[in-house]
Amino acid sequence: MNRRSIAITSDNVTAAYWRYALPTVMAMLVSGLYQIVDGIFIGHVVGAEGLAAINMAWPWIGLMAGVGLMIGAGAGTHCSIAQGEGHFQRAKGFLIQGMWLLVLLGVVVSVLIIAGRDSLLALQGANASVQRHSSGYLQIIGWSSPLVMASIAMPILVRNLGAPMLATIMMLVGALTNIVLDYVFIVQLGWGLQGAAIATVTGESLSAVIGLVFLFSRYSSLPLSLALREFCLQPLPCRQILLNGFSSLLMYLYASFAALLHNTALMHYGSTVNVAAYAITGYLMTVYYLLAEGLASGMQPLVSYFHGAGQSALVRKVFFLAMRWVMGTGVVLVLMILIFPYIGTRIFISDEDPALDVAAIDAVRLHLFVLFLDGFLVLAAAYYQAVSDSRRATMITLANMCIQIPFLLILAPWLGVTGILLALPLSTIVLATGVVTLLRRQFSLRVGVNK
């Protein structure tokens, strides 16, 4: 989406969408593969306590990932809109301010994780062994927060500069490096969760460096230079980036908040085994979330560009194309989970842990039966973010967080572990119904205006 882009019409918009979506989906799935491989190695080498420790670290990891995505999505959206309007110097400014935010907020997140990791683990009810594993993991990740956040933001910025394939390669390099080092550090050297953390930081740092080099190279459509007078911190563009990307942060805060509530409730009404089973549902959810985020991210540059160019019909066409694929793949995955749950669960469980095997199968059936609606909510929030309607994007994500609380408070005392696992899908059904109504009203208004 730059000055060299050809005009996109309704005849070739599908091809343009897949040009962005396919590399993004591939990159998302491969980047998520290292998380899955982490879980496989930890489940087989460390066991249920290791899986529970990773899940209890997730509230902090989600905060870090969310801040990185907020900066990347906010800067990328404004960069694409500015390019669509023909304001190329302004687009460069958003890239520069995005990098400033990665540095400054990265330091803040590092301090929060290092200072608060043990308190949050204790709040979730972690026993001594789980707390030891999780605290060591978070210490390494915490010190490296700016680099990890940059690895999340950089592919989005590169993609919005018209280089989706390079964004995919960046994520592939980081993920494959992580997987190889996981095997060395966890299996061969026996470093446990600390080994997983070192592997993660190394792989993601490599990905971030590749993206940074591209932004300053002649191969970028908007090459940056340290000599630019705009290369200083500017409050207004930073505020615009943060406001636009805030819903992305909230999506991860929602995931962190959900993990915190579920971990605490499962330790109260169940045991470490139930938290480990919940962690396995999280890994399976990750596969679909990354697919949905990839399809939504592939939509974002096109929707932002068409919105900036005032082409509402093409905005609508791209959105509904992405929705068909998000919902369709979600339904297929849910059917597989309900019919063959053991295919997904047993790759994380050693033969010596039958209790976790039983708990995990029950957990995925109860917790994931409307997973496709979660994908729909991801896409809806991404759409509003892409058209710079941060208010509605934020509203969807905040509602997703708030609506779970009453379901957990009612179902947990009544049904115990079963009620805890049902809280998310039931609340998702309620929220998705409201979002469908919101979108139908908006697109009806758009059609009326176009007429």
Predicted regions and their residues:
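Short alpha-helical transmembrane segments in multi-pass integral membrane proteins
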Residues: 1-21, 79-146, 188-245, 303-370, ...
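Transmembrane alpha-helix boundary and packing residues in multipass membrane permease domains
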Residues: 24, 28, 40, 77, ...
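Transmembrane helix-bundle signature of multi-pass secondary active exporters and lipid flippases
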Residues: 24-73, 77, 141-148, 239-305, ...
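Juxtamembrane/transmembrane-helix interface segments of polytopic membrane transporters
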Residues: 31, 35, 39, 43, ...
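Helix-loop interface residues and adjacent transmembrane-helix termini in multi-pass membrane transporters
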Residues: 33-36, 45-48, 82-85, 160-161, ...
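Small-residue-rich hydrophobic transmembrane alpha-helices
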Residues: 51-111, 148-162, 166-167, 277-341, ...
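Short runs within selected transmembrane alpha-helices of multi-pass transporters and secretion channels
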Residues: 72, 141-160, 167-175, 196-211, ...
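Membrane-water interface regions at transmembrane-helix termini and the short interhelical loops
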Residues: 154-162, 182-191
